[in-house]
Amino acid sequence: MALAEAPRPGPLMDPEWHGSPEGKEYLGCILRKKKRKFFGLIERPVLSPQLPADIASYKLFVCGRSGAGKTSFIAKLAGLEVPSMHHETTGIQTTCVYWPVRPTHSARPVIFRFQFWDCGEGALRKFDHILPACKEMADAVLFLFSFTDRSSFEDVPALISRTLGQEEDVARVVIGTKLDQYTHTDVTENDLRDFQRTWQLPVMRVRSVNGPRVAEGRGLDGRVGLVECAPVLNGLAEILWRRDQVIAGLVGGAD
């Protein structure tokens, strides 16, 4: 996974902290026997008294056309098995992902609680209440396209217009999925640069494939998976933390 160059300057979060000895200790709270821990809506990581941290909770609505890779994207970040076949999500599905980060000007880490909301395109069209429910109290909307489907990329501006009104003050992030299928890509780096220059939105790139498994083969290697997901999780943390700081008047917004 990789984060494309974004228009917002200056990191507020240390993007390399997760690889430090202290960062690895905190990562231990979301791992169990080399595998990822999975958390329900009311569960949270258990930290020892020697590992103080604050919790910052955010709701993220993941949207995109059918087959764009929404469910696979969330599964990748959560350490779940990436589905080998496409199945339309029925109704609304929520997934909690915890990620520890340390602000650049603080010695006290923050554990981000990302609550991802996903729903199938069919459900959105059939039930009028689904879209308002997904957007209610959302901090960010993630607009997904597939690198293997150029039309899904070209549809992103229209997708944004269909999903959000100009008055809706939420973070907007574009995610390109299926980066692992580079031999079939229909979207180039020049396309991404032109898009960012025009729309002034951050673009992230995601591999929609399972990472290595643990030695016995039963389950995915949680620590390796976290390293793969770190650029995107750090990127989302940076965007949401900066947004909060701008709203609070603690830092300036984008130029």
Swiss-Prot record:
Record organism: Xenopus tropicalis (Western clawed frog)
Keyword Mitochondrion: no
The name this protein goes by in its record: Ciliogenesis and planar polarity effector 2
Protein residues bound to GTP: G64, R65, S66, G67, A68, G69, K70, T71, T177, K178, L179, D180
Family: Belongs to the small GTPase superfamily. Rab family.
GO annotation terms (biological process): cilium assembly; exocytosis; protein localization; protein transport; regulation of exocytosis; regulation of vesicle fusion
Keywords: Cell projection, Cilium, Cilium biogenesis/degradation, Cytoplasm, Cytoskeleton, Exocytosis, GTP-binding, Nucleotide-binding, Protein transport, Transport
Chief place where the protein resides: cytoplasm
Record-linked PANTHER family: CILIOGENESIS AND PLANAR POLARITY EFFECTOR 2
Superkingdom, taxonomy of origin: Eukaryota
Any one cellular-component term (Gene Ontology): ciliary basal body
Role played: Potential effector of the planar cell polarity signaling pathway. Plays a role in targeted membrane trafficking most probably at the level of vesicle fusion with membranes. Involved in cilium biogenesis by regulating the transport of cargo proteins to the basal body and to the apical tips of cilia. More generally involved in exocytosis in secretory cells.
Subcellular location: Cytoplasm, Cytoskeleton, Cilium basal body
Region (Small GTPase-like): 52-255
